[in-house]
Amino acid sequence: MLTLALPGRSALVLIADGDRTPITATGGGMRIAALPETVRGDTLSVAGTAAPGQTLQLVLDGDLAQASAVTADAGGQWQTTLSTDALMDAAIAHRVVLWDPVAAVASEARTFRAEKTWREVLRIDDPVGDDHGRSGRIRYPQDPGWGDNHQGDIERITVYQAGSALKIDVRLRSITGIWNPANGFDHVALTAFIAMPGKDGGSRIMPLQNAELPEGMQWHYRLRAHGWSNAWFDAKLATAVNEGTPLSPGAGLHVDADQRTISFLLSAEALGNPESMSGAKLYLNTWDYDAGYRKLSPEGGNMVFGGGNSTDAKVLDESAVLIFP
């Protein structure tokens, strides 16, 4: 068993020398009590044992920078509450250990999965066949990969909440994987803008799309996703030619091709840990992306949208501005 703390963005190469050494137990008296297999909600109560008065670090998924300090009482018992709000994917098994930075040893790991309890807060059905841009004249590129697929035609947007975390489901007329995209969909890019309640600042500019947000909306967070990227931005530094300030963590992404639905998962941490999402606004549009939002020209082409000038809005289909109850 190897236990080693490494600085962020570092790596270690090990070469076996051929010698064998028996594995011995590590961690001394450090123990974490059994955890539930599945955690629902935004917190997890964690308890265990250590030497009386000993201060250790409780580490989730190997992230020492965000470790919580725990100190055992006179009886060698400790207890703390671990935030699970940022854990969005129920398929992932999360790992918790106690770490002794003095002795550089870790306890036996405990694992659990985190499952959100989502409630629907918004749903809007979008007209079929309105994927022709703000002018009504935009045409898909002529390559048959688009053809009758209409990957940019939004049919429904459904928003769910769990605390201040969000799940945004976008159902399209079709989802294709013709180009073997890493994210499970191609021939379309989705761009979403979120305005936070009670937050100053923001921007009306839709970076790189030659347009502004409708209805006077000003965004604080922006999501841009296509088959090979999934990026999350703050409005700081955003201009017509600058997407804003990249942020982490970003959105989780899941594609259900059978249901023609792309889902985005945003933790409360990604949204700045707001006390409430009541009054927040969401706007979403489609286009496509190829080293930038795909080109537009009056005549169009195999890989170029047609029906507009290069300076026209790069918006194929779009939602209204949706306001959270």
Report the location of each language-model feature.
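Ser/Thr-rich low-complexity repeats and stalk/linker segments
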Residues: T26-A114
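Glycine-centered loop-to-beta-strand initiation motif
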Residues: A72-T80, I168, D258-F264
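Acidic/polar low-complexity flexible segments
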Residues: R113-P127, A195-G216, A270-P325
